[in-house]
């Protein structure tokens, strides 16, 4: 335990808070190109085939991001926009792909929470 004199000479340094989405480099979204689109299975109590894509960002980082909603049109070399936000039951997936932006189509026949899935207003 330091003495008061030592604390006056060199005060305590606050712990630095690390960002949970570091590869975005403090940007709200980042553009990238899909290098691989595949499905993966979630952690223990859950069971599904979750759609994910490996994306090379414009800053050179490669990240795994989740494709939300039913059905998608993504394939290799698709240009996508990603945002932060992890998927709790997929280890290593810390980003989401934005639907209805760039090469990603919105979810078809979506009626509720449309803005989250890039769906147009139904007629």
UniProtKB/Swiss-Prot annotation:
GO terms for biological process: translation. Residues 1-28 are annotated as: Disordered. Signal peptide: none annotated. PROSITE patterns: RIBOSOMAL_S12. It comes from the Bacteria. Keywords: Methylation, Ribonucleoprotein, Ribosomal protein, RNA-binding, rRNA-binding, tRNA-binding. It holds the Pfam family Ribosom_S12_S23. InterPro entries: NA-bd_OB-fold (IPR012340), Ribosomal_uS12 (IPR006032), Ribosomal_uS12_bac (IPR005679). The modification 3-methylthioaspartic acid is found at residue 89. One of its GO terms (molecular function) is rRNA binding. One of its GO terms (cellular component) is small ribosomal subunit. With S4 and S5 plays an important role in translational accuracy. NCBIfam families: rpsL_bact. Part of the 30S ribosomal subunit. Contacts proteins S8 and S17. May interact with IF1 in the 30S initiation complex. Belongs to the universal ribosomal protein uS12 family. This is Small ribosomal subunit protein uS12. The gene is rpsL.
